[in-house]
Every structure is written in C-alpha cells, then in structure tokens.
C-alpha cells in the first residue's frame, strides 16, 4: 500500500475531523481520482506525435491512455469530428496514491523556477487543477528520448464539498501551495 494512503488514513482523517468538526469518518474529504490529460493538437498533421504523447503518458502513469477525439469539426483549427487530438488517463486506487506521492515529492519540486502552486486553481467544488509545461519533470521520462517537450493537465478530484475543504485536504498532504 502507498505510504501516502496510510498517512491519509492515520493522520489526515483525524486532523480534518477536528478542523471541520465532522461527526463521521465518511464526511472527511478524500482524493477520489487523478486525471492526466495531454492535448496534442499537432497530431492532425503527424500521427506519430500522438503515439509519442501516449507513450509518455503511459510511462508517467503506468497505465495505457485513452485516445481522445474531437467532439465537433472546427474549420479554424482544421479538425473534423472524430479526429484523434489528445490522450488522457484516469488514475484511481493504488496507482492514484503512488502517482500522487511521486507528484508531490519528486515531480513538482523539479518544475523550473518553482515558487509554489497557485491556491486559486480550485473549481468551487473542492477539485484542484494544475498545468505542467514540461513532461520531463517526471523521472520516468528519459530526457534523451523526448522528441518534443509537451505539457499536460493534472486534475485532482476530491469528495470535498467546498474549496476550503479541498485546500485543507491537499495542504494536509504538504501540497506545495504558494504562500
């Protein structure tokens, strides 16, 4: 079992129960899933780019990504409905906790000019979204084999009812928010 999951069950639950005066352990917010999304708009011209992006996402997450397709045709972007334009992975359970631990301890501190993550990136329902400009911050990606530096979106979905609860949950994991 991931260390962070044990830490959540042993420490974070108790801390949040006293902070928010919950009556039941089931009221305490928890991390439900983590979604990684990589938009590869250039895949319209070169299909190999999408394969490389999917390979990067597989290395980062340890799970085969789902190829996302365009929902509707947009003439300005020269895309048609059904064109493959990105890939995404939804992590739950053990893989989610392992990724979350690697994200906090290894990947985020490797971001160039890192001063902390914005605490304003909550969606109003306790879910946190962040963008990463370079996939090479993850140690699973071999810098020499990267054909192009790509960014990805990371969404942490929680069961929190408000941004305040979500922020408290992530802060309990020592999430590096900007002061």
UniProtKB/Swiss-Prot annotation:
Please give a single GO biological process term from the UniProt record: translation
Q: Name one GO molecular function term.
A: tRNA binding
Can you name a GO cellular component term? Answer: ribonucleoprotein complex
State whether keyword Cell inner membrane applies: no
InterPro entries in the record, alphabetically? Ribosomal_uL5, Ribosomal_uL5_bac-type, Ribosomal_uL5_C, Ribosomal_uL5_CS, Ribosomal_uL5_dom_sf, Ribosomal_uL5_N
User: What Pfam families has UniProt attached to this entry?
Assistant: Ribosomal_L5 (PF00281), Ribosomal_L5_C (PF00673)
Keywords in alphabetical order, please: Ribonucleoprotein, Ribosomal protein, RNA-binding, rRNA-binding, tRNA-binding
Task performed by this protein = This is one of the proteins that bind and probably mediate the attachment of the 5S RNA into the large ribosomal subunit, where it forms part of the central protuberance. In the 70S ribosome it contacts protein S13 of the 30S subunit (bridge B1b), connecting the 2 subunits; this bridge is implicated in subunit movement. Contacts the P site tRNA; the 5S rRNA and some of its associated proteins might help stabilize positioning of ribosome-bound tRNAs.
Q: Subunit structure of this entry?
A: Part of the 50S ribosomal subunit; part of the 5S rRNA/L5/L18/L25 subcomplex. Contacts the 5S rRNA and the P site tRNA. Forms a bridge to the 30S subunit in the 70S ribosome.
Similarity field: Belongs to the universal ribosomal protein uL5 family.
HAMAP family membership: Ribosomal_uL5_B
Q: What is this protein called?
A: Large ribosomal subunit protein uL5
| Naturally occurring in which organism (per UniProt) | Salmonella arizonae (strain ATCC BAA-731 / CDC346-86 / RSK2980)
């Amino acid at each position: 079992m991931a260390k962070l999951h044990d830490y959540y069950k042993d420490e974070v639950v108790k801390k949040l129960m006293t902070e928010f005066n919950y009556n039941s352990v089931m009221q305490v917010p928890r991390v439900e899933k983590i979604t990684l999304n990589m938009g590869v708009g250039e895949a319209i011209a070169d299909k190999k780019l999408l394969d490389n992006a999917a390979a990067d996402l597989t290395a980062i997450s340890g799970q085969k990504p789902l190829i996302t397709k365009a929902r509707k045709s947009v003439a300005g972007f020269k895309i048609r409905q059904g064109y493959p334009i990105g890939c995404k992975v939804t992590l739950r359970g053990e893989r989610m906790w392992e990724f979350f631990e690697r994200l906090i301890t290894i990947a985020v501190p490797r971001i160039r000019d890192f001063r902390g993550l914005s605490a304003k990136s909550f969606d109003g329902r306790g879910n946190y979204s962040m963008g990463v400009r370079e996939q090479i911050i993850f140690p699973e990606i071999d810098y020499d084999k990267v054909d192009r530096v790509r960014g990805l979106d990371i969404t942490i979905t929680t069961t929190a009812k408000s941004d305040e609860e979500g922020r408290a949950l992530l802060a309990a994991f020592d999430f590096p928010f900007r002061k």
